[in-house]
Design a protein with these regions (language model features):
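Compositionally biased, low-complexity segments enriched in small residues
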Residues: 3, 21-23, 127-128
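C-terminal segment of classical bacterial N-terminal signal peptides
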Residues: 19-30
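Bacterial N-terminal signal peptides that target proteins for export
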Residues: 2-18
Length: 266
């Protein structure tokens, strides 16, 4: 997919891992960045599976109604602020095919829903038991969304590993957000995206060094070109961002996902 490859190249070239301790101030001084206020922490629980086609589009038809009932109730009473399910559009042997997630303003609220899903949601199937699966919990203080539901929206998501000698993930995210949050906020106001977040792994079941994760939700296919164009303009106007944030990434080995999502935000 030529279109997706172009977007990956844009993010890959700038790198999202952070800034070196030495030279951080000097590098950012010439770039157009602003101080961004951190929001209260937001927690995101993600369950991923590598369901083989044709199951990847809807791997749990029998149990999805039970899950949706629990998630909708949790959103209505304020336990969750968002939830959704995703299907990867560019399949590979290493990456997930299907993922489900929920967002809450505390770990306690998040795990309350996870526990309810385990007890009263869909039951395990032979396909579930034979499929590779992993869970991750992310935390972020840099995020925003538009309330509502979107079916068949698109998500660009990327994960970058920090070098062993890099600043910690929180410092890297703060530096990253000084450029990206204003860009994403403008996209949100213009209707190009309906949600964004820049976060790090808090708890995970994969063996990896500290990681930074970003994701953006584009409401429809027509918005994909608008997103690409707006991001390209922002990067062209801030050329120093590329070397600044690329300096701490682990050999430019990002992981990127281009997925379709059904998402609801409160």
């Amino acid at each position: 997919m030529k279109y997706t490859f172009h977007i990956v190249d844009v993010f890959s070239s700038m790198g999202v891992a952070g800034l070196a301790v030495l030279g951080m101030t000097a590098t950012l001084a010439g770039a157009q960045t602003v101080e961004v206020k951190e929001k209260p922490p937001l927690y995101r629980y993600v369950s991923s599976w590598t369901f083989p086609p044709p199951h990847s589009a809807d791997p749990d038809k029998d149990g999805s109604a039970g899950n949706q009932k629990i998630l909708a109730a949790a959103l209505a009473d304020g336990t969750l602020v968002g939830y959704g399910d995703e299907e990867n559009q560019v399949h590979s042997a290493e990456r997930f095919a299907h993922a489900s997630w929920g967002q809450a303003r505390s770990i306690a609220r998040l795990m309350k829903v996870v526990d309810a899903l385990h007890k009263g949601g869909s039951s395990s199937t032979p396909l579930d038991s034979s499929t590779r699966h992993w869970d991750q919990i992310y935390i972020t203080s840099f995020y925003n969304w538009k309330a509502g539901s979107w079916k068949g929206a698109y998500v660009y998501a990327g994960t970058s590993k920090l070098k062993p000698d890099a600043p910690d993930a929180d410092d890297a995210i703060r530096a990253l957000s000084s450029f990206y949050v204003p860009v994403f906020e403008k996209m949100l106001a213009d209707g190009i995206i309906v949600e964004y977040e820049i976060d790090r792994e808090m708890i995970h079941t994969t063996d990896a060094r500290a990681q930074i994760h970003f994701s953006l939700v584009v409401p429809n296919a027509e918005g994909l070109d608008r997103f690409r164009d707006a991001l390209g303009v922002a990067l062209d106007q801030n050329s120093l961002i590329v070397p600044a944030f690329g300096s701490m990434m682990d050999n430019f080995k990002e992981q990127f996902d281009f997925v379709k999502v059904n998402a609801t935000y409160k």
